[in-house]
From Swiss-Prot:
Keywords: ATP synthesis, CF(0), Hydrogen ion transport, Ion transport, Membrane, Mitochondrion, Transmembrane, Transmembrane helix, Transport. This is ATP synthase protein 8. Belongs to the ATPase protein 8 family. The chain crosses the membrane at residues 4-24. GO terms for molecular function: proton transmembrane transporter activity. GO terms for biological process: proton motive force-driven ATP synthesis. The lineage of its organism: Eukaryota, Metazoa, Chordata, Craniata, Vertebrata. It is found in: Mitochondrion membrane. PANTHER family: ATP SYNTHASE PROTEIN 8. F-type ATPases have 2 components, CF(1) - the catalytic core - and CF(0) - the membrane proton channel. GO terms for cellular component: mitochondrial membrane; proton-transporting ATP synthase complex. It comes from Polypterus ornatipinnis (Ornate bichir). It is a single-pass membrane protein.
Length: 55
């Protein structure tokens, strides 16, 4: 049974993980958010109680 021969599949596995661990992290981390997140001052946030009209 050729499926049980680990020789070609093991090398494919090693090369695939080598690509995943060397090339892809650089491509993923090079992306930047288009909009910077703004931090709001927590003292300006006013929360009001909102009563639901249950009829």
């Amino acid at each position: 049974m050729p499926q049980l021969n680990p020789n070609p599949w093991f090398t494919i596995l090693i090369f695939t993980w080598a690509v995943f661990l060397t090339i892809l992290p650089n491509k993923v981390t090079s992306h930047k958010m288009p909009n910077e997140l703004l931090t709001k001052d927590p003292s300006n946030l006013l929360t009001e109680i909102w009563y639901w009209p249950w009829h």
